């Protein structure tokens, strides 16, 4: 897949590096060409630039750098981006993007002599035969090596996602240091899932703003964007099956397709979330007959009466409609804060739910069983539509139910403050996979309601790790490895939507996202102080 719109124009750091090389007499002239194939390379002068000082300076930091004697590599206008596998290689789009980001370098295709100053992009043997922008399955798929030797640069990875990560490292190193120091970078992420969750239901964000966030995520090697687009306040994506539920301010499906395609080209997966059986106020406004009512006639905002067959029908309609729009194989089912289960006497106050539970699951079944079965059924719906990785919020899992939650569903752990909330260690003992969205550190809630101050990058950088799932204390290290706690997302919730503009949100989350990127990529204690990390983040 070739993305027509590339990530950015030349940065100030790259421009400065090219200017310095021109002064040194190494740049050459002429208009950069798109590419060439099968030509014999003309002689290129050996660059005489000052050695690049190491180690590489990037956000996140690289896992390993082995220094060597030499000048390193700097971008020059006579340099080329070389793709030995040719123009149809899965890394062809990475090469073209990278060449433009480096100031309009020439891309060349096919096996040939790599000249001084050139950059070579190639897949390792185990990457042969992979489709372009194919999904990655573990952190090994995102690994890469960058070698600066003899004024040449070689980027090697098993996948195009790994090559993309390598190009981000090179660009950041150029911005911070003017180039890449002599030696070898060996790098891969600690956690497979690294991302950002955005509540577009409570607050409308325009498509361009969301696209800018995707590009920012990709530059930090964050690889997920979760879109929470349905809630009590609004339903924010066009629906052909149920246009009656869609809010006036919304994204069209074409806009979403564009966002998903941009994200895919930048190796970011967009994860859709239609929350149920709670947080459905926008749907219920158009379908009040499906609203949950207590025995005394009280309506519960956003809560669907899941004893009614029509409830499952409309939610499954929506899940099936939107599945083709989000082909990234991930789905979030919500499942949190169902009002009936926040009640001290749910069976007494919602007898229709208690009755439905017994009818479906037997005499001893409870409303918790009914809610668990509801999520299991929605899980089956999205898996039948192609989803492979399904998750739900932690308060959508209940202890001691007769109905077991689908064992393959991931727990998105956000809080221990809800009624009946369980310790994260319980899910890990059940051998469940967990993603960290700890509201103590990773929740940016507009207006700071309920004593939730805006999180800071400094606090994340200094105190939080992927194992800190609830409050401020980590779960045991033996149960919080990358195979158990898959990663983390920083979340923006828009409870008081008018409290910040889109620009204020972008400014407010900038450093928290950079701190998160560091902590999910590299499990080691950060080498830089917070002040030095901030300075570096502003450079790269």
Residue positions per predicted region:
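Structural preference for beta-strand elements that scaffold enzyme active sites
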Residues: 193-197, 224-226, 267-271, 330-332, ...
